[in-house]
Amino acid sequence: MTQTMIHYQDQWPVVTGASSGLDRGLAPLLARQRAAFLRNGPPSLAERRANLKKLRAALLARRADFEAALDADFGHRSRHETAIMEMLALTWGIDYLHKNLRRFMRPERRRVSLPMRFARARVEYQPLGVIGIVAPWNYPMSLALTPLATALAAGNRAMIKPSEFTPATSDLLVSLIAETFSEDEVAVVTGDAAVGAAFAALPFDHLFFTGSTAVGRTVMRAASEQLVPVTLELGGKSPVLVDRGQPLARVATDIAYGKLANAGQTCVAPDYVLLHESEVEAFIEAWTKGVAALYPKGPASEDYTSIVNVRHYERLRGLLDDARAKGAHVVETGPSPEHAKRRAHTLAPTLVLDVHDDMRIMREEIFGPVLPIVTYRDLADAIGFVNARPRPLAVYYFGSSTENRRQVLTRTTSGGVTINGTLLHYVQDDLPFGGVGASGFGAYHGIEGFRAFSHQKAVFDVRRWNGGALLRPPFGRLTNFILSFMLRQARTTSGVPIEVRNAAVIHASIERVWDLLTDVERWPSWWRACRWVRLEPPTRAASVVFRWKAHPVELRSAVVKSDRPQCFAITADGRGVHAERTFTLRPTPDGSSTVVVSHETQVGPLPWLGRAFLAPRLHAVNQTMFEDLAEAAGQVIDGGRAI
């Protein structure tokens, strides 16, 4: 296949339809892949696993080549950083897919509605067809091949468009894919910005894009012309929230690692840190020591990565110049860029203090080794600061308070969260990875990635007896009876409560009956008379849990009144169902016996739940209860009489 080159830019030209002419080589390639997909059908489990094995073996065989190519593309990049951040993460992901693929492919059974209960319902996961993958320059190997591995696992074919900013890596991807797969299975397309726009405008079955929010808008606009579903993995300003009183030596080192890996050119890199106003100086000291421990020679260290090119380097310098001009205090760690003479476009680890929203550095995604510090007075201020900005791709929280952690998790919205660390949620293969709002939508990794590249086909299998046929014309008395029964059940359980009252006289003192009645270990046996209900043994009266065997709905109960020894009441709620049971105890005139009155009401929206709580069954439950009390405390003088 003839190869050209593509530029990764802040804006792409908009290409609609097939009018540009640039797609004349792309559209036939897409057509060949789609024809092969339709001709051969979905690949089997064995074929998908074989493709994953081929990809993994090819990667490991070219490891040294990729390390050299990325070093050349960045001006300098540690081979260990490439091996860890790209090769290792990618092979872990492939191994995860290989291991779990059988489970992912398995059809999922679903519930069948009552009139057709003898039928079968399931969801089957079907390959979409041809997946388009647009990869960025910051991790050009893993961010091209991780979605490819997921697409292959889901049974698809794929076309990849890598970035022009990393030409050596792009050329290596071309040769690796050509040696491993046929062109109608996987192909790599290179070209300039116009080719990239034409690629995004192709009628793929799904388009996966990783890159900036600005380009993501252009890609989505182009895909919408063809009604192509998209997954957008974008960026954003991912905050680090450091709770007060944390061990700053460890915290600062963890933040420095997340910020300085790949020189901050990571979509989930910490973009700014929120510190309590009393801890800024201590953090700066801890940061300086942490950076020195990670990179003893500062930006001249062998393990420290350069900025990808002069253009991006100058953009970062422009952010710092703008911040200085507007009153920020800039603190560089290690030699300044001018003294890092061993390599070009290398930026020192940098802190920026006294920042405000008028600065570009607080409005734009930084994507470099520059970390602004924002101070807060209390946690609510910090959370409000995060929520006042577009939703980020990641949030990082350092803290030991369970309550504060829960506040951060529930009151902020982000693509993902790592607690007491940075970056690490990305490499958890069983967790979905994706953005929200301006940081993207859709997710990959885990079963979510497999399903993103699959069509979730609903399959309903009608068996020999079909209850739905009873509701076909000609309508008559049977139809009226069925409708009357079904609609009455729904009405009864949604609005009109079921009410049951029973009473019995137990030959025992009121104190003795009270003790037996509130002994929660006895309660499960009372419900044996109701075959739809199982009451699990509770540990205490306030933690009773009802479980309906016919449906995984839980009805949790709590004691709402306990006036010893006259009155005891519990309520139960779940899925719109509300139940209330009150036990009233009063002694007979001579005090030798006790009258026990049970009054229960049930109301809820589910028809089957109404059947489970029909009055006769509740009467049977009460009868069982009274018999148990009598056996333990004396004889029943007038047992289980409905009143």
Regions found by a protein language model. Give the residues of each.
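Beta-strand/loop substructures that line and gate deep hydrophobic ligand-binding cavities in soluble
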Residues: D573-T624, E631, G640-R641
